[in-house]
Amino acid sequence: MKRRAVTAGMLSLGFAAAGCTIPARQPSVPRAGYERAKPLGLANARYFVDGDATALIAEARLAAERGRSADPQSSGDGTISFLAISGGRYNGAFAAGLLEGWSRVGTRPAFKVVTGVSTGALIAPFAFLGSDYDALLRDLYTTMTADRIFRRRPLTAALYDDGMADTTPLAELIGHYADWSLLERIAGEYAKGRLLLIGTTDLDAQRLVIWNIGAIAASGHPDSLDLFRKILRASSAIPGAFQPVLLDVELDGQKYQEMHVDGGAMAQLFVYPPSLGPLAANSLRRFRAYIIRNGRLGPAHGETERRTISIAQRAILTMVAAGGSNDVVRAYFVAKRDGVDFNLAFIGEDFEPSVRLGEFNPAYMQALYAYGLDKALANDVWHKSPPGLVGSGVAR
């Protein structure tokens, strides 16, 4: 009887699979011309961490010129502040609480550059535009539920689809908040010399792509808002779990598509590409970097079931955690090399929620938001180096 049931189940799966087709896409960009492909025809829409830094250096210098033009009275010797917000899914509640507490204390800088990856990419535009959006972030990261992010697909999606979940709900959420008004405000800040940079991973090219959101916003292109929304969705697209985002580009008159996913597949955070270091090192101005790591930086002990899926999940989480820690350490040493003042915030061992950790559990996120808020209000949040390194105490 059992054998008959198993056979029937396998036949049903086979018939279901027979009606499935792999999602289609346009050809990827040829390797030889990859860096010449331009989304929306914009030359400064994006940059590559591992590519020729000439264009990015030119963009940084133009931003400095715009800043001087916007504020002619500036002496040019003030401190330039960077903010980098990492990935971390629902742990983005930590950043949301920290930012609001920082605003209340009154010491939150007007950042010259804000960067974001994954959940940090969703937070970054609002952090970039200032404390007016603190309440919005509080609402998002204390009431969010999984059904507002994704819809689960059947198991056959593992073989015949592009992700185990459909992120149409996330696209709708992004569409609600990322509107023309928001884009116009970003363009206005770009005109003042400020930069908003979002990281995605191009799976075809296996490269981290840094999107210059201000330039896209200021382009006036009718499809700029659509591209902005797709970038935000792509930066949060966990490979395999969430569907990727296909971005249209053009090269030599031919149309191609690039497959973009979570920037965390390459780096869970970035402050600035290392190639820009000489600009900071040779400048008379002071540079200060603030990094918000939406996660812990120590091991998360837990018993692993002796099951294939459990072992694989635990191994992936371990690799992700290790990658995040390495990104923080890398940012620290790059900052030290360039003489940039380093400040790091992360979820510490003193965060012990009484509620269960789960996929977008509002009670857990509310507790984490309150933790970040209280840490900022107490001025007990910034560390001068990653844990375990000399001088890793709290900066006050």
Which stretches of residues belong to each language-model region?
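N-terminal export leaders
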Residues: 3-7
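Alpha-helical hinge/cap motifs
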Residues: 8, 118-120
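Patatin-like phospholipase
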Residues: 8, 21-112, 128-396
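C-terminal motif of bacterial Sec signal peptides marking the signal peptidase cleavage site
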Residues: 16-19
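Catalytic nucleophile serine of serine hydrolases
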Residues: 89, 117-118
